[in-house]
């Protein structure tokens, strides 16, 4: 069929299949703003276009409908090198993070302002209601529209976007646009899907329909014979190598319990066969031709089921220890299944697979018996949390190709260096033959710390020699991606009558699902990032992680801390009620203070114990709680309005800034011949603004404009090793490496500048904009670089920095919530939510606020509406965004505020600490304690639903 239509003002004539999806059609025409986030259901809005004057989801259209249509995409906004008014406002406000659907947002807002000169909040909410954003938290979009409206009348108009910090510094703590925001909001090619070549093959995966089963028969011959099928990968022809999908520093503190393909299926969605074909359509057709027979086994779905004496064993294969094998290993292996498969454990992590235990650890300080004996009151409560999904706007995706004899991996990953190491081992190549390019990442939140499809894609390219694309559908995100662990946490508290704690005991049990990636470290963070909030002389913790047959779990932002914090905060609040003490008062009597030793952390480590006892070197909780109390009007009356009851709650929170003694970051900075700089950073910017942090740190040290610094990051050929984007490590680890590299280069510039000026080094200094200034005069960086590169020069000037540390930097914060609960219907209305956070010196204040809003809204979603649900046979019923319950703009609190409360930390660069992860740790307990304050019930399992409210009120 030949169709005629107008695209961004240009007439088009195309021969198409009438039923072709318009999103795919436009994307293939180079309209990279029209993206697919939700399998074409039209929920996410990433595919928004203007169709004959109306905002429409392109995925819901077929090509035949374009006949005589007028189409506008985000490519019509601005010019190739000039942002539109709305795009510029988005960049200036700092709303662009992962950026994946920001072109769609710019188009929708532009259309709104074309129709309504000064839209109300309700009109803004309505216009953006069809857009899904997992990272920005929505609140800053109101600022975007406020700024755009102001600039329509006055192009120089400004609004109050974010506070500034540190008057003694030039660029740190000041506004500066995110370095990659412009290209993302303009939809310039920067994601993996934008790099795919026309000759690329496509992978489609046949997945298990059973939660627990053995493959008894597998025949792929008919699929292999289908024209256009290039290769089929199964357990019969994949590498016989065991690994963990978890992207962690080697040796990994997780069981190596995964084979690329195995005979045993351990969850619905587990891998059976991968078809590599010339097109997606052929690959899907080939999947239907694969003949598989299963022996279906009884699934294990919960922690209690996994603990049962007669529970089915999820991992029944033999175990091999690299070091530290237990005395029981030989006996355990004698009862193992002999299928030619096994599991490897690098070092003891308390694993007992025959008991469905993936990992366990125990630790304590003080004398627990004495602590409880000294108590006037003792309480013990158990708290449960459900499985939650990261829902990155960009689904998991990988594109691999050969470049001569080298394997090139274009990846949407948080861990390019770990990915390279793991894939090289699996495909049998040396690391220098594997080149990982981390493209812009359309949302990660921990899920892209794991290697979930890259190794299959890489193996397919190695076997066939062809470029290969493997992209998850949204359904695969729910059944094959890693999600947040289910947890069951029991807390026992002993306290004096005044509420001061004498003993704290936490039993943290987690459900890791079918594989053990992060099975030690995520649950360990439950006590590690909650117990130190309330230092006590007598503390005991037990962590046990169980295998099951639910869909996989792994890293998710917060990394165990939200579960532990919910339990300890709720238990303390229940203790406060029993003692008739105000919740905020009992927090004040027990909370951590600046400079205090955190002794319990001496007993908790991520694979190894800390070399010293950490302390709260910087902690602004006193000021945070003072401000929060005033903002929420903590002690003011809470009037009842009919069936609606008002309540207020609070939770204090903490996080880390990297993993001391385990992780490392490196950086190199080169002075160019015109006096500008190129930074080669190993860090992985996944939308958090790390490249901007590195830019500003280099500019601050080198006294040059940030515009004179360009960052190349996350590319294993063009940067030095960095552990990656996890554990809130970016600012402290990657940032400190950049600071050290800049300081190293600064000394070289000063030395050669002093020589050129004929002055002692002690008499010269760097000065803005990019000069060495002495008593006799000054010389520019460009002149120094040029002299170095002449035939008689001293060579290119390069600075390097390598950062490791034994020291911790802890950000702190508090969440305050005000809810209204309808005691007749069970409805919960979140009226106010205030997130106050201490991230040391905020390097990028507007981006930091965006990180807080986004993380906090994700936590609100986990608390109020999100959960993965299964039937009795282990089939996940939640398989798309429409049924999952992640919040959109209409779900944010009416009064939603993020506040930066600075402190000065000695570990982070220029006093900075992490910011992006801590925001997810406190919403659940803040909301739950507010619900209790409103209507007197304790909800000990989240998320919170009207049914749970009414059940607790004994109304159903």
From Swiss-Prot:
SMART domains (alphabetical): Ald_Xan_dh_C (SM01008)
Cofactor: [2Fe-2S] cluster; Mo-molybdopterin
GO biological process, one term: purine nucleobase metabolic process
EC number: 1.-.-.-
Record keyword Iron-sulfur present: yes
Binding-site positions, Mo-molybdopterin: 414, 445, 727
Gene Ontology molecular function: 2 iron, 2 sulfur cluster binding; iron ion binding; oxidoreductase activity
Coiled coil: none
Keyword Nucleotidyltransferase part of the UniProt annotation: no
Alphabetical UniProt keywords: 2Fe-2S, Iron, Iron-sulfur, Metal-binding, Molybdenum, Oxidoreductase, Purine metabolism, Purine salvage
The record's free-text note on cofactor binding: Binds 2 [2Fe-2S] centers. Binds 1 Mo-molybdopterin (Mo-MPT) cofactor per subunit.
PANTHER family: ALDEHYDE OXIDASE 1-RELATED, XANTHINE DEHYDROGENASE
Protein function: Probably has no xanthine dehydrogenase activity; however deletion results in increased adenine sensitivity, suggesting that this protein contributes to the conversion of adenine to guanine nucleotides during purine salvage.
Similarity-based family: Belongs to the xanthine dehydrogenase family.
Name used for this protein in its record: Probable hypoxanthine oxidase XdhD
Gene coding for it: xdhD
């Amino acid at each position: 069929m030949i169709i005629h239509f107008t695209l961004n003002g240009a007439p088009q004539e195309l021969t198409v299949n009438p039923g072709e999806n318009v999103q795919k059609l436009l994307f293939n025409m180079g309209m990279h703003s029209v993206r697919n986030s939700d399998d074409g259901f039209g929920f996410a809005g990433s595919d928004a276009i203007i169709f004959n004057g109306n905002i429409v989801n392109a995925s819901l259209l077929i090509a035949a409908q374009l006949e005589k249509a007028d189409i506008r995409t985000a490519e019509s906004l601005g010019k190739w090198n000039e942002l539109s008014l709305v795009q510029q406002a988005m960049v200036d406000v700092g709303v662009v993070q992962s950026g994946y659907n920001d072109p769609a947002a710019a188009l929708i807002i532009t259309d709104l302002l074309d129709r309504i000169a000064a839209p109300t909040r309700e009109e803004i909410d309505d216009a953006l209601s069809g857009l899904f954003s997992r990272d920005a938290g929505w609140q800053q979009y109101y600022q975007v529209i406020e700024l755009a409206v102001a600039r329509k009348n006055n192009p120089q108009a400004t609004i109050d976007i974010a506070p500034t910090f540190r008057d003694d510094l030039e660029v740190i703590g000041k506004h500066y646009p995110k370095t990659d925001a412009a290209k993302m909001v303009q939809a310039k090619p920067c994601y993996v899907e934008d790099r795919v070549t026309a000759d690329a093959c496509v992978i489609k995966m046949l997945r298990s329909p059973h939660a627990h089963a053995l493959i008894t028969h597998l025949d792929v011959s008919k699929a292999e014979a289908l024209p256009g099928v290039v290769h089929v990968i199964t357990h019969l022809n994949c590498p016989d190598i065991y690994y963990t999908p978890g992207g962690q520093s080697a040796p990994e503190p997780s069981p190596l319990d995964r084979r690329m393909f195995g005979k045993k299926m351990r969850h619905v969605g587990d891998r059976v066969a991968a078809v590599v074909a010339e097109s997606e359509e052929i690959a899907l057709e080939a999947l239907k031709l694969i003949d598989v027979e299963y022996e279906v086994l009884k699934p294990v779905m919960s922690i209690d089921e996994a603990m049962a004496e007669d529970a089915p064993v999820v991992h029944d294969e033999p175990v091999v220890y690299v070091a530290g094998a237990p005395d029981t290993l030989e006996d355990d292996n004698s009862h193992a299944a002999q299928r030619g498969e096994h599991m490897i454990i690098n070092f003891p992590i308390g694993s007992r697979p025959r008991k469905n235990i993936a990992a366990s650890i125990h630790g304590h300080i003080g004398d627990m018996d004495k602590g409880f004996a000294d108590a006037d009151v003792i309480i013990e409560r158990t708290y449960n949390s459900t499985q939650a999904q990261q829902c990155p706007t960009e689904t998991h995706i990988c594109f691999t190709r050969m470049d001569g004899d080298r394997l090139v991996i274009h990846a949407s990953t948080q861990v390019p260096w770990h990915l390279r190491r793991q894939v090289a081992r699996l495909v049998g190549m040396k690391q220098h033959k594997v080149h990982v390019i981390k493209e812009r990442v359309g949302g990660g939140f921990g899920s892209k710390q794991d290697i979930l499809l890259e190794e299959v894609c890489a193996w397919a390219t190695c076997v066939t020699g062809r470029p290969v694309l493997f992209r998850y559908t949204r359904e695969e995100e729910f059944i094959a991606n890693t999600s947040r662990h289910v947890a069951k946490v029991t807390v026992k508290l002993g306290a004096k009558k005044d509420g001061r704690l004498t003993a704290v005991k936490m039993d943290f049990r987690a459900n890791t699902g079918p594989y053990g990636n992060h099975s030690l470290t995520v649950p360990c963070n439950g006590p590690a990032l909650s117990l130190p909030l309330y230092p006590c002389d007598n503390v005991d913790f037990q962590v046990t992680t169980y295998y099951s047959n639910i869909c996989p779990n792994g890293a998710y932002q917060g990394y165990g801390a939200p579960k532990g914090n919910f339990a300890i905060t709720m238990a303390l609040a229940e203790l406060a009620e029993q003692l008739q003490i105000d919740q905020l008062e009992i927090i004040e009597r027990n909370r951590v203070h600046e400079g205090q030793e955190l002794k319990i952390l001496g007993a908790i480590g991520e694979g190894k114990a800390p070399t010293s006892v950490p302390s709260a070197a910087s902690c602004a909780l006193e000021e945070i709680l003072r401000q929060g109390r005033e903002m929420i009007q903590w002690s003011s009356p809470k009037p009842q309005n009919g069936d609606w009851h008002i309540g207020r709650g609070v939770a204090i929170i903490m996080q880390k800034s990297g993993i001391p003694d385990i992780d490392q970051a490196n950086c190199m900075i080169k002075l160019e011949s015109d006096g500008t700089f190129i930074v080669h950073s190993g860090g992985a910017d996944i939308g958090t603004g790390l490249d901007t942090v590195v830019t500003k740190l280099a500019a601050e040290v080198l006294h040059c404009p940030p515009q004179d610094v360009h960052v190349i990051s996350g590319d294993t050929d063009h940067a030095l090793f960095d552990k990656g984007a996890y554990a809130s490590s970016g600012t402290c680890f990657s940032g400190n490496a950049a600071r050290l590299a800049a300081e190293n280069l600064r000394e070289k510039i000063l030395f050669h500048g002093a020589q050129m000026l004929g002055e002692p080094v002690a008499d010269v200094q760097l000065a803005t904009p990019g000069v060495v200034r002495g008593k006799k005069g000054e010389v520019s960086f460009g002149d120094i670089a040029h002299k170095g590169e002449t035939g008689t020069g001293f060579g290119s000037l390069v600075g390097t920095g390598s950062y490791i540390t034994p020291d911790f930097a802890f950000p702190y914060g508090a969440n305050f919530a005000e809810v209204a609960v309808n005691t007749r219907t069970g409805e919960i209305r979140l009226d106010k939510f205030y997130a106050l956070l201490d991230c040391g010196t905020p390097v990028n204040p507007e981006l930091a606020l965006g990180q807080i809003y986004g993380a906090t809204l994700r936590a609100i979603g986990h608390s109020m509406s999100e959960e993965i649900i299964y039937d009795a046979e282990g089939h996940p019923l939640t398989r798309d965004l429409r049924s999952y319950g992640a919040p959109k703009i209409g779900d944010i609190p009416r009064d939603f505020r993020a506040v930066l409360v600075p402190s000065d930390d000695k570990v982070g660069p220029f006093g900075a600490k992490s910011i992006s992860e801590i925001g997810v740790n406190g919403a659940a307990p803040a909301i739950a304690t507010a619900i209790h304050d409103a209507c007197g019930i304790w909800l000990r399992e989240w998320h919170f639903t009207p049914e749970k409210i009414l059940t607790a009120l004994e109304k159903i």
